Amino acid sequence: MEIKIYQINRDRDKNFVKFLHYKHLDNFQETKDINASIYDEVFRGDADCEGLEDVYRMFNTEGHPLHRGHSLSVSDIVVTKDGAYYCDSAGFLKVDFDEAKTQKPEPYDGGLC
């Protein structure tokens, strides 16, 4: 399964939404829209997963050698061919997410691609 994982960069997180449940976003930033400009791409590549729950298990508990971020957690975004998904306290929510606004830390080798 081809995926990308994005995680919030604390230096750009002026509203303190890292690890925040989706339902509380508007309390901290006046909207539930995802601010892609505070996210860093931390993984891009093929993961041996069938679905989002497998992605969670791999990147939260098992790990992946090319993953550059912390374990997958609340507020992280997983992008698949079907769209972008917000990792929430119980599962994933499909969201609008503008990948063009994200940051790709240097040096960046693109994971498995």
Each model region followed by its residue ranges:
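Extended boundary segments
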Residues: M1-A47
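Residue-level detector of intrinsically disordered/flexible regions characterized by low predicted structural confidence
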Residues: Y6, Q103-E106
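Short non-domain terminal segments
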Residues: K14-V17, D26, E41, R57, ...
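Short, conserved turn/kink motifs that form compact alpha/beta structural patches or helix kinks used as
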Residues: N27-V79
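Short acidic DE-rich linear segments
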Residues: E106-C113
